[in-house]
Amino acid sequence: IIANYGAGFNNIDVTYASKRGIWVTNTPNVLHETTADLTWAMILGTARRIVSADRYVREGKFQGWGAKLFLGGDIHEKTLGIIGLGEIGRSVAKRAIGFNMRTLYHQRNRLPKEGEQELNIEYVTFEKILRESDFLTLHVPLTEATEYLIGNDEIALMKKTAYLIHTARGKVIDDYALVAALKEGRLAGAALDVYENEPEITEGMSELT
């Protein structure tokens, strides 16, 4: 038996395991609150430039207060876009209520009106969620439909002031397109928990601050 620690199992060749008579199990519905917390840590950290500011101080560069030094961006009353409203996406949406955000979501199947009202969320098209989100967070599984869901064309639709948050599966984003967009100032920032070709970090990613 291969008992996978987590809900996803795309790291296992299930077809081959089945041929060899090996059972494959996963552990769904145990980490969605934890991952939602991580998502919000990444939203806050990226918007407020916490990691960059911490590195700046530790490197001995801090020379005193500056009005625009690591100014960052606000979260309160901004627009949050959630792509994929499974258990993690819903938990992320619940936390957005405390920031009085306008929360948009997109997935294949729309929730009943009661579910949308409970989470204070609005269903929109894929194009609209790209265009209107100040913070776009991804919570989809890796499938043929979601592989490279976000690439050059999708980033081109996003605001230059937008932040992209990624805690799903690496190949949902074209990392090279993301690196180029960040270097060229076509996005305000990004926070990634996963990479396209793990364990390798995409070329150019570590140079970004």
What kind of region is each of these model predictions?
Residues 1-58, 72, 164:
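Phosphate/diphosphate ligand-binding glycine-rich loop within oxidoreductases
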Residues 1, 13-16, 145-164, 175-176:
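Rossmann-fold NAD(P) dinucleotide-binding segment
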Residues 24-25, 161-209:
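Rossmann-like dinucleotide-binding domain for NAD(H)/NADP(H)
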Residues 65-160:
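Rossmann-like dinucleotide/phosphate-binding beta-alpha-beta segment
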